[in-house]
A protein has these predicted regions:
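A ubiquitous short alpha-helical element
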Residues: 48-54, 93-97, 166-168
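Active-site neighborhood of HAD-like aspartate-dependent phosphohydrolases
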Residues: 18-21, 25-85
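Short, acidic loop-to-helix structural element flanking the phosphoryl-transfer center
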Residues: 102-103, 137-168
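A metal-dependent, Asp-based hydrolase signature
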Residues: 86-136
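Short, surface-exposed acidic
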Residues: 70-86, 114-130, 190-196, 225
Length: 288
């Protein structure tokens, strides 16, 4: 007998008593089949946990970085910024062979050296950019970038923690570690209970490549069906090709692949409903 069934109603019959069980729910079905239990929730950062004018931040960051590169390499700032832009486009588009296992940071550094003639791995040069990320960039948040915690973000993290689930930050890894940790600070996320934060140095692909997601799950010892991704980007926050990771969508629009849709405040307030949607989606796939 299914031990999850509750509220039995007993009806008298001509001979003895009969027990009437309620119809099994979607969750009852998946528990009977052997639930693939949700173990972790992984979040995007920009416009998910962090409200930010991302275009303004990117422009500010890479304008400063390209100026530093130009000064170091004694090149024009305009030309250096253009070359750096093509490198970043290639990085984000994952334009490299499937057998290229360099980290995103190694790809970035080697392409800067090849196209701009500047060795970013040189200890003195590396230290200069690390200093910028950690000591200068934190003061760049202004009325234009306007970075702050997304309403509902901290409550969402608390809901995940209260549910006993693991948590990680799966932000697009097109920045070095220091430039990821900086906006985390703007959103008061530095002390969040993330087991893992993705950045250039610990990834080999960018979103939405499924390789990016699967590599990080391997580090965490998780399977795709044990994880819920939370993000706002209808392209980047849905692994391509589909690898079995479900996504709760907190952006604009109605992506057909979304397991659940709403705001971060909705996510925090209705987290039980989010979990139920996760299992309903899972059993629907099992039964299809």
């Amino acid at each position: 007998m299914n031990t999850r069934l509750r509220n039995l109603t007993i009806t008298s019959q001509a001979f003895g008593f009969g027990v009437k069980y309620p119809e099994p729910t979607t969750l009852d079905q998946i528990y009977e089949k052997g639930a693939r239990v949700l173990k972790a929730v992984v979040f995007d950062m920009d416009e998910t946990l962090l409200s930010i004018n991302l275009n303004a931040f990117i422009l500010r960051y890479f304008k400063d970085v390209s100026s530093m590169l130009a000064d170091i390499g004694h090149r024009s700032r305009g030309g250096t910024m253009a070359r750096l832009g093509t490198i970043l486009v290639d990085l984000n588009a994952n334009r490299r062979s499937g057998t290229d296992n360099r980290t995103n940071l190694e790809f970035y550094q080697e392409e800067v050296e090849r196209r701009c003639g500047i060795c970013l791995s040189d200890p003195l040069i590396y230290e200069a950019f690390t200093y910028y990320d950690r000591e200068v960039l934190p003061y760049k948040n202004d009325d234009v970038i306007n970075a702050h915690a997304m309403p509902g973000a901290h409550a969402a993290l608390q809901a995940v923690q209260d549910a006993g689930l693991r948590c990680a930050l799966f932000t697009n890894p097109s920045f070095p570690q220091g430039a990821i940790e900086c906006p985390m600070g703007w959103g008061d996320l530095a002390d969040a209970p993330f087991e893992l934060v993705t950045h250039m140095g610990n990834t080999t692909r960018c979103k939405p490549d499924a390789t990016y997601y699967l590599e990080q799950l391997q580090v965490m010892g998780l399977e795709p069906h044990e994880v819920l991704m939370v993000g706002n980007d209808p392209k980047r926050d849905f692994p391509s090709p589909d690898c079995g990771i479900q996504t709760a969508f907190v952006g604009q629009g109605k992506p057909s692949r979304a397991t659940w849709r709403g705001t971060m405040e909705d996510f925090a307030r209705d987290f039980d409903a989010v979990i139920e949607a996760f299992y309903e989606h899972q059993v629907a796939n099992e039964l299809s």
